[in-house]
């Protein structure tokens, strides 16, 4: 499908430090360019075996994250954060990188975005959090869409995590792309 992916986060740390898993990280993490998400979503929804599923905010009403997951349907990974979801099996996290504002401008946007998502997705029984979630979410999405448009129009070459995720990632595009190979549990993956 010609989608550049690379191991990321704890998986990348484990590959560099241990050649594989690290004891305190219980999943696999990969990342892609956000612009590749629609193609990846379509490919995974059409081609995953029946015992696995693709999961994100477009496939599950109460999905509480701005990252995607590929889950095993025949397992249960009991995390309180995900108890309201239909599928809760073990998973691979799929993060996104996209053109980014400098961190000092991003942090307030991410903070509000995260609070809105949590308020809207039944993470709180407090009426005020739920109300503010629904009130501020459309405004936050508009701001994020404008920032993404700005990144495209001005060909921003600094990449950060997807909006709505606490992150300190803010690097030049050429630090990540083109991807290279790294050993992980005896296999080669892109990093």
Regions found by a protein language model. Give the residues of each.
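Short, conserved charged micro-motifs
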Residues: 38-42
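Active-site nucleotide-donor binding segment shared across nucleotidyl transfer reactions
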Residues: 1-28, 37, 174
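A short secondary-structure junction signal
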Residues: 103-109
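Conserved aromatic-histidine-acidic binding/catalytic patches
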Residues: 28-29, 187
